[in-house]
Amino acid sequence: RDSRLRPVVMGSHVDSVPQGGNYDGLAGVIAGLLCLVAQKQHGYAGSLPLQVVAFRGEESAWFGKAYMGSGALFGKVSADDLELKQRTTGETMAECMRKVGADVDAIRTQQMLFDRSRVKAYLELHIEQGPVMVARKLPLAVVSGIRGNVRHNRIQCFGDAQHSGVVPRWLRHDAMFAVADLIMRLDEHWRVLLERGTDLVVTAGVVSTDPAEHS
């Protein structure tokens, strides 16, 4: 085979999240490997080379930021990202990457470690993680792209801590009411954007107060 032929790359991610669904990510990696096995068993090379890739660190659940594995390949991981800590062990991303043999120095300087111009096409098989295909009774679908991920890890609303039993409404500045108002305004903006044809989803995650000043 001509070594100048650009390969088709198949794969997905090998990390998941709690309740991510059976075979989240892994289905795409296994599908690619099975294609390679089938090619070998049947002596079929195909018109283009086939390569399989497995990404790690694609979910945001562990470091608070998504696409770390693929981002590292394309020079998108910053020095600040490498200092993010793993939620269960407290190790930095740099430490975790170094443990598995990644070139952390190259990643820190945002070098391009993978030339995507050398790839003919990318194909990823993935499970359905939402209700749309089930609701529409679709056994499978072709997806041309996925939503990106814009995350604000910490949004703070400040108020005044007061005695909850004696301070009247006109003298209160409750931070929790401001948080509730902010979330409702986000929901309203979301509705307006959907009506304009924008495709996005919005989620408000963990809400908490200062343990020492609940009131």
What are these regions (language model features)?
Residues 1-3:
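A non-catalytic alpha/beta surface segment that caps or lines the substrate-entry region
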